[in-house]
Every structure is written in structure tokens, then in C-alpha cells.
């Protein structure tokens, strides 16, 4: 009986000891929980399952005992005040459509009814993009590059559509540095010249929100994909491109040398090296030389090449044509009377006016045409007298106008004389050929000349 009592006493003591140890353990857990660092992080993913959003939280220290800890979010919710996150190992999450996506929420770590730590976060600023998928790399032989394509889940989303992608690739062996390419589309190209020939490469891609309202973090890397670069072309062989370029270059240089040699004097040299003009020749071209042989004579023969229009002669001709009934030549008796009057008029003039200038003859000719007939207008001008210095010794000299006199033996034969300048329409036009004049005109000229000679002899 004593043995049975001892046994009950031992069992009771053991029960008390076990119960005391268990109570002390719970109190110790509370003390340890208060002393640990409960810092955490959270991120959201929008429209992961239709209109439902996902919120995920976890502690920064993975060694924390999370047996009695829980996460709770309050504020910026649609129909509820607070929501408690579900636990999956060391991760806390909740999938719901109650997020307002406007304003900030209060996320707290709780142990029982006690809040250990809290953070104020906005769901739209902690968005984590979804990882791209279906990454493919295709080699294009014609373009000599690699085409990289992948799928981004955000293209079909309602809220988050604009994201930035980061494509990273590196050789699969022997190198740890990644080459990054940033883009906003789901396809890109990698030129073959940037890759090593006949090498295996690893490539992967990730995304991050790129929006003014929705901001957040990089997504997880997509599953890696590998591709191999081809061998270099014509390795160890003959490249026909370089010789072709060399031959074309030499031929072009040879052609340029020939053209330069042919066109040097006519085209190239005047442009590259212009010649200076001679100043003497330039001055000769600019300055006109004065004429040395100026014709200042009043001789009618000097104006044979010129057409002289006399206004008075034209007026006199018009008056003659209006007064004369016909253009019949004058009778011989009238011609003799005219010659006699001309001789008497010449004898009565003073010796000082020895020669009748052409202007006097031209001025008197229209008057004679008016007084008598047009035939008298064609008579050549004669010397009215000789020079005042005329001497007796000069009498034996032949007269100046000897050609005007007929031969002494035959006075009735026409004598060729220089054709005078006929008066026609006020223009002096020379007659190139000598024509025989009428006998009456020759007699008048001879009579006038003999009369003047007798006048000088008497004087």
C-alpha cells in the first residue's frame, strides 16, 4: 500500500512539472517575439485572376518564428474594413477584388491581438510585374542576326499595360557578366557580329511597370533559353569580296588619271589655276584707238559712200514738180541763153570769190530748177574765177577742168566728162560711169570758161 502511494505521488509531480514547463514556454515565446525584428516587405499583382488582385507579404528575416504571427490590412478597401492574409509556409498572401487601388492601406504584423509592427502602403505603388513567358530565339541567315520574341501577360491587362522589359544574355560557359538590352516591345534582334562564333548563349527576360500611376518592382526572370551561334563563313578559304573591291578601286584610279590628263588644259587647269590676263591687251580692248585718217574734206567725192539728205532740196523738188507741167527737156536755144547769162554773171563777180563752194552750188540749184528746167540741175559746178595770185606766167598752164572742154577740132562731138552728182529727191547719189553729155551743155560750159579766161586776161 505504501508502494501504491509513492507511485501516485511520483505521477502527480510529473504532471505538475510538465504543466509548469509548458506555461513557461508560452511566456518565453512572447518575450522572444517582442525582442525579434519583424520588418517585412509586400508587393501587389493586378488582375492575376480576372478582376482579383494579389497581395503578398513576407518577413525580411527568414529565421523568425512565424508560428503565432499574422498579417492584417486595413483601409482602402471596398466593402470591408480589414482583411487578414493567408499563410503558406513563410509567405502571407490574399487574393481579392476588394482593393480600391486608390489611397493607402495600413498593413500590420499581429501576435494575437497585439500589433507588433505596421507600415502604410499604397497598392498601386508596390506593383510587381508578372514574368514574361514563351521566350524564343531564331537565327535569320539573310539578316545575319538573331530574332528574340516573348510573351508579356500585361498586354491583356486593364490597368497595367505599359511595362519595360530587360533582355539579358551571356555565353553559357566561361563568363558571368550579362549583356542587357532594354525595350518596350516583345521582340528584339541581336546582331551576329556582337556574338562569338560557334558558341552557346543563355538568354532570359524580365519586366517592370513603366507608368506614372502604377509603380513597383521587377518581375521574376523568365525561364532561360539557349541558342548557338553558327560557324564563320569561308573559314580558312578565299574571300572574293576583297580582291573585287581592290580591282575596282585600281580601275577607278586609272580612269581618273586618264581623264585628268585629257581634260587638264581645257577644263581642270583653268578652274584650279586660272591665268592672269595681260594688262596691255586688256587696255587695248577697253580703250578705242582714235581714227588717224579722218575725212575733213568738203569735196563731194569724199561723200560718195554717204547718202546726204537735204531738206531744202526736197522742198525745192516738191515745188518744181507742182509748178512744171511736164518734164520735157529744154530746147537748145534756151540752153544757150542760160549759158550766156551764166558767163556774164561770172564775169561781173569779184575775183576774191574765186571758188563757189559746194554749199552755194547746192543752194542755187533748186532756184535754177524753179526758174528754168530740171536739166539744168544736173550741170556740174564750175570755177567762177581763178585765184587772185594768178600770174601771167601761169596762163600757159592747162586749165584745172580741162576734161570739161571738148577738143578744138571737133566741137560738136560729145566729150566724156566726169559725171556730176545728180540732184534726185534731195540725195546726192554718184554716178559710177561716165556718159556723154549733150552738145548744148558742152557749149554752155565752154562758153563760160572762155568768158572767164578773157576776163582775167583783160584784167
UniProtKB/Swiss-Prot annotation:
<dbReference type="GO" id="GO:0043029">
    <property type="term" value="P:T cell homeostasis"/>
</dbReference>
<dbReference type="GO" id="GO:0005829">
    <property type="term" value="C:cytosol"/>
</dbReference>
<dbReference type="GO" id="GO:0010628">
    <property type="term" value="P:positive regulation of gene expression"/>
</dbReference>
<keyword id="KW-0472">Membrane</keyword>
<keyword id="KW-0732">Signal</keyword>
<feature type="glycosylation site" description="N-linked (GlcNAc...) asparagine">
    <location>
        <position position="115"/>
    </location>
</feature>
<feature type="region of interest" description="Disordered">
    <location>
        <begin position="378"/>
        <end position="413"/>
    </location>
</feature>
<dbReference type="Pfam" id="PF18447">
    <property type="entry name" value="FN3_7"/>
</dbReference>
<feature type="compositionally biased region" description="Basic and acidic residues">
    <location>
        <begin position="388"/>
        <end position="397"/>
    </location>
</feature>
<feature type="short sequence motif" description="WSXWS motif">
    <location>
        <begin position="218"/>
        <end position="222"/>
    </location>
</feature>
<feature type="region of interest" description="Disordered">
    <location>
        <begin position="337"/>
        <end position="365"/>
    </location>
</feature>
<feature type="disulfide bond">
    <location>
        <begin position="74"/>
        <end position="82"/>
    </location>
</feature>
<feature type="topological domain" description="Cytoplasmic">
    <location>
        <begin position="265"/>
        <end position="459"/>
    </location>
</feature>
<dbReference type="GO" id="GO:0005886">
    <property type="term" value="C:plasma membrane"/>
</dbReference>
<feature type="topological domain" description="Extracellular">
    <location>
        <begin position="21"/>
        <end position="239"/>
    </location>
</feature>
<dbReference type="GO" id="GO:0019725">
    <property type="term" value="P:cellular homeostasis"/>
</dbReference>
<dbReference type="GO" id="GO:1904894">
    <property type="term" value="P:positive regulation of receptor signaling pathway via STAT"/>
</dbReference>
<keyword id="KW-0812">Transmembrane</keyword>
<keyword id="KW-0325">Glycoprotein</keyword>
<dbReference type="InterPro" id="IPR036116">
    <property type="entry name" value="FN3_sf"/>
</dbReference>
<dbReference type="GO" id="GO:0010467">
    <property type="term" value="P:gene expression"/>
</dbReference>
<dbReference type="GO" id="GO:0030217">
    <property type="term" value="P:T cell differentiation"/>
</dbReference>
<dbReference type="InterPro" id="IPR003961">
    <property type="entry name" value="FN3_dom"/>
</dbReference>
<dbReference type="GO" id="GO:0070233">
    <property type="term" value="P:negative regulation of T cell apoptotic process"/>
</dbReference>
<feature type="disulfide bond">
    <location>
        <begin position="108"/>
        <end position="118"/>
    </location>
</feature>
<dbReference type="GO" id="GO:0042100">
    <property type="term" value="P:B cell proliferation"/>
</dbReference>
<keyword id="KW-1133">Transmembrane helix</keyword>
<comment type="subunit">
    <text>The IL7 receptor is a heterodimer of IL7R and IL2RG. The TSLP receptor is a heterodimer of CRLF2 and IL7R. Interacts with CD53.</text>
</comment>
<dbReference type="InterPro" id="IPR040997">
    <property type="entry name" value="FN3_7"/>
</dbReference>
<dbReference type="GO" id="GO:0000902">
    <property type="term" value="P:cell morphogenesis"/>
</dbReference>
<comment type="function">
    <text>Receptor for interleukin-7. Also acts as a receptor for thymic stromal lymphopoietin (TSLP).</text>
</comment>
<dbReference type="GO" id="GO:0048535">
    <property type="term" value="P:lymph node development"/>
</dbReference>
<dbReference type="GO" id="GO:0005654">
    <property type="term" value="C:nucleoplasm"/>
</dbReference>
<dbReference type="InterPro" id="IPR003531">
    <property type="entry name" value="Hempt_rcpt_S_F1_CS"/>
</dbReference>
<protein>
    <recommendedName>
        <fullName>Interleukin-7 receptor subunit alpha</fullName>
    </recommendedName>
</protein>
<comment type="similarity">
    <text>Belongs to the type I cytokine receptor family. Type 4 subfamily.</text>
</comment>
<feature type="signal peptide">
    <location>
        <begin position="1"/>
        <end position="20"/>
    </location>
</feature>
<feature type="modified residue" description="Phosphothreonine; by PKC">
    <location>
        <position position="282"/>
    </location>
</feature>
<feature type="disulfide bond">
    <location>
        <begin position="42"/>
        <end position="57"/>
    </location>
</feature>
<feature type="compositionally biased region" description="Polar residues">
    <location>
        <begin position="347"/>
        <end position="357"/>
    </location>
</feature>
<dbReference type="GO" id="GO:0001782">
    <property type="term" value="P:B cell homeostasis"/>
</dbReference>
<feature type="short sequence motif" description="Box 1 motif">
    <location>
        <begin position="272"/>
        <end position="280"/>
    </location>
</feature>
Amino acid at each position: 500500500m505504501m508502494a501504491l502511494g509513492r507511485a501516485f505521488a511520483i505521477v502527480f509531480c510529473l504532471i505538475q512539472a510538465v504543466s509548469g514547463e509548458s506555461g513557461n514556454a508560452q511566456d518565453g515565446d512572447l518575450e522572444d517575439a517582442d525582442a525579434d525584428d519583424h520588418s517585412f516587405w509586400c508587393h501587389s499583382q493586378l488582375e492575376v485572376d480576372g478582376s482579383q488582385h494579389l497581395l503578398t507579404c513576407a518577413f525580411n528575416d527568414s529565421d523568425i518564428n512565424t508560428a503565432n504571427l499574422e498579417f492584417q490590412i486595413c483601409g482602402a478597401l471596398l466593402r470591408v474594413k480589414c482583411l487578414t492574409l493567408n499563410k503558406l509556409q513563410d509567405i502571407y498572401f490574399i487574393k481579392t477584388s476588394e482593393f480600391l487601388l486608390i489611397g493607402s492601406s495600413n498593413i500590420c504584423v499581429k501576435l494575437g491581438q497585439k500589433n507588433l509592427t505596421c507600415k502604410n502602403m499604397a497598392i498601386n505603388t508596390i506593383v510587381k510585374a508578372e514574368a514574361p513567358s514563351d521566350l524564343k530565339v531564331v537565327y535569320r541567315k539573310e539578316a545575319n542576326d538573331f530574332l528574340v520574341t516573348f510573351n508579356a501577360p500585361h498586354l491583356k491587362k486593364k490597368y497595367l499595360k505599359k511595362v519595360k522589359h530587360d533582355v539579358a544574355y551571356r555565353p553559357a560557359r566561361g563568363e558571368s557578366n550579362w549583356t542587357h538590352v532594354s525595350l518596350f516591345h516583345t521582340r528584339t534582334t541581336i546582331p551576329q557580329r556582337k556574338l562569338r562564333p560557334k558558341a552557346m548563349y543563355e538568354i532570359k527576360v524580365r519586366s517592370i511597370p513603366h507608368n506614372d500611376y502604377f509603380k513597383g518592382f521587377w518581375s521574376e526572370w523568365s525561364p532561360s533559353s539557349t541558342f548557338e551561334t553558327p560557324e564563320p563563313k569561308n573559314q580558312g578559304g578565299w574571300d572574293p569580296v576583297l580582291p573585287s573591291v581592290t580591282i575596282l578601286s585600281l580601275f577607278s584610279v586609272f580612269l581618273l588619271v586618264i581623264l585628268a590628263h585629257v581634260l587638264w588644259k581645257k577644263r581642270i587647269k583653268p578652274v584650279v589655276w586660272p591665268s592672269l590676263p595681260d594688262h596691255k591687251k586688256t587696255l587695248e580692248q577697253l580703250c578705242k584707238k582714235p581714227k588717224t585718217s579722218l575725212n575733213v574734206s568738203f569735196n563731194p567725192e569724199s561723200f560718195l559712200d554717204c547718202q546726204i539728205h537735204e531738206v531744202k532740196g526736197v522742198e525745192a523738188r516738191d515745188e518744181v514738180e507742182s509748178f512744171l507741167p511736164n518734164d520735157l527737156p529744154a530746147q537748145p536755144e534756151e540752153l544757150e541763153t542760160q549759158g550766156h547769162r551764166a558767163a556774164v554773171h561770172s564775169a561781173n563777180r569779184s575775183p576774191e570769190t574765186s571758188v563757189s563752194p559746194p554749199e552755194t552750188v547746192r543752194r542755187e540749184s533748186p532756184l535754177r530748177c524753179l526758174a528754168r528746167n530740171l536739166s539744168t540741175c544736173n550741170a556740174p559746178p564750175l570755177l567762177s574765177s581763178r585765184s587772185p595770185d594768178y600770174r601771167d606766167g601761169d596762163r600757159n598752164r592747162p586749165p584745172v577742168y580741162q576734161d570739161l572742154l571738148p577738143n578744138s577740132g571737133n566741137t560738136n562731138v560729145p566729150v566724156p566728162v566726169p559725171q556730176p552728182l545728180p540732184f534726185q529727191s534731195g540725195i546726192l547719189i554718184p554716178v559710177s560711169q561716165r556718159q556723154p553729155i549733150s552738145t548744148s551743155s558742152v557749149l554752155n560750159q565752154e562758153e563760160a570758161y572762155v568768158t572767164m579766161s578773157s576776163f582775167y586776161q583783160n584784167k
